[in-house]
A protein has these predicted regions:
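C-terminal "cap" of GNAT-fold acetyltransferases
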Residues: 21-23, 135-191
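Acetyl-CoA-dependent GNAT
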Residues: 22-110, 122-124, 128, 161-165, ...
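Active-site acidic-Proline motif in GNAT/NAT acetyltransferases
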Residues: 109-111, 115, 143-144
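Residues forming the Rossmann-fold NAD(P)(H) cofactor-binding site
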Residues: 115, 119, 123
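Short coil/turn segments at alpha/beta junctions that flank glycine-rich nucleotide-binding fingerprints
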Residues: 115, 131-135
Length: 191
């Protein structure tokens, strides 16, 4: 009986101590770009809005497009080898903020939420933007994305007036200063 209990305890400890293996990667191959297109489409479907005003299909066809290094970034998150999330950063011109970039397409699949992937992706994109010497990072999000807005505020973003036309009611616009001032971090990640 004692050996069974010890074996069960060892098995339980091994199962609970095995943390998921999370990896952030930059897509480089045709299959990785196809996976990026698929998860971007999943993201758009989850929003429940038509992104045609952002030329979404043209963006997908041209990947990496504006998200190409060195000024842009395109990230996929995997958990134990399974595609779990995505995010991107691109230069942003013709806005009222000098030397700006924009965080785009931050999305974590529902089955992988609660692991901190959204924070990891957002932090990695902000780190990239700082290394690329951007002054500010902008983003927009929707009214019903309360958890995302909470994350953005925790990362130092503040609400601002609209920086571009968005026909979707309830859009929120946020900005984070990148060239000075303290902001919370969760550790540095390399792209």
């Amino acid at each position: 009986m004692h050996s069974r209990r010890a074996a069960l305890a060892a098995t339980t400890a091994a199962a609970t101590s095995a943390a998921p293996r999370v990896q952030l990667l930059t897509p480089e191959s045709p299959p990785q770009f196809e996976a990026t297109r698929a998860i971007f489409r999943e993201y758009a479907a989850a929003l429940g809005v038509d992104l045609c005003f952002q030329n979404f299909e043209a963006e997908l066809a041209a990947l990496p497009g504006e998200y190409a290094a060195p000024r842009g970034a395109l990230l996929l998150a995997t958990v134990n080898g399974e595609l779990a999330g995505c995010g991107a950063c691109r230069p942003l011109r013709d806005v009222d903020y000098a030397n700006a970039c924009e965080m785009k397409r931050l999305y974590v699949r529902p089955g992988f939420r609660g692991l901190g992937l959204g924070r990891m992706l957002a932090q990695a994109l902000m780190d990239h933007a700082m290394r690329a010497a951007y002054s500010v990072m902008l983003l927009d999000t929707l009214d019903d994305m309360e958890a995302a807005r909470g994350l953005y505020v925790a990362l130092g973003f503040e609400e601002i007036p609209p920086y571009y036309f968005n026909p979707i009611a309830g859009a929120h616009y946020l900005k984070a200063e990148l060239d000075g001032g303290a902001r919370p971090t969760t550790g540095r990640m390399r792209l």
